[in-house]
Amino acid sequence: AQVGDKLQVVSFAGGLLWALIVFTSLLGLNRSFSHETESGCLEGVLLAPIDRAVVFLAKATSNLLFLLMVELVTVPLFFVFFLSGAELSPATPMILLPLLVGTIGVAGVGTLLSTMAIDTRGRDVLLAILFIPVAFPLLYACVSATGVALMGVEGTFATFWRSLALAAAYDVVMIAAAWGLYEFALDS
């Protein structure tokens, strides 16, 4: 890609956007349990007479809200810095759908994996090593859907909806698995 080659920038902008989202979410997910572990509150949470699934729901919801707030800032900045000179398609607002579906999946899977990496020495690296392969199908589908929405080429919107359906199916399966496995992750 050369400077001024507007089509080239738009063609890989979906991948750049999701790389930005993944790395910022990994930073936030690494810190999601830091307050509880540093002050010893995690033991108090575990002693409370509530189901561990409720703890997962609360942590996943707080991680989701954090990620949505980060995206509220970073996505407009991404458009300003990377796509300000590019011609965007009229379908560009459709990127909100893969952003929402992808963020839900990142928060759900990331909550489970960050819980598993709480007490490890290199938890920052371990979370990235665990997260990226596990979340690859979700990221692939979201990058595909985001790229289609940004380019807006006629006849490719079937790919958008297929990718979005794949991401939503991933969310359902992986969040259900995380919900069921969270008690074991907390106990270890």
Predicted regions and their residues:
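Membrane-interfacial helix-loop-helix connectors in multipass membrane proteins
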Residues: 3-12, 75-98, 146-164
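Long, hydrophobic alpha-helical segments
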Residues: 13-29
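Transmembrane helix boundary and interhelical loop/hinge segments in multi-pass membrane proteins
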Residues: 26-46, 60
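Selective transmembrane-helix segments that form parts of the transport pathway or gating/packing helices
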Residues: 50-79
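Transmembrane helix segments
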Residues: 113-162, 166, 170-172, 176
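Junction motif at the cytosolic side of a transmembrane helix
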Residues: 171-188
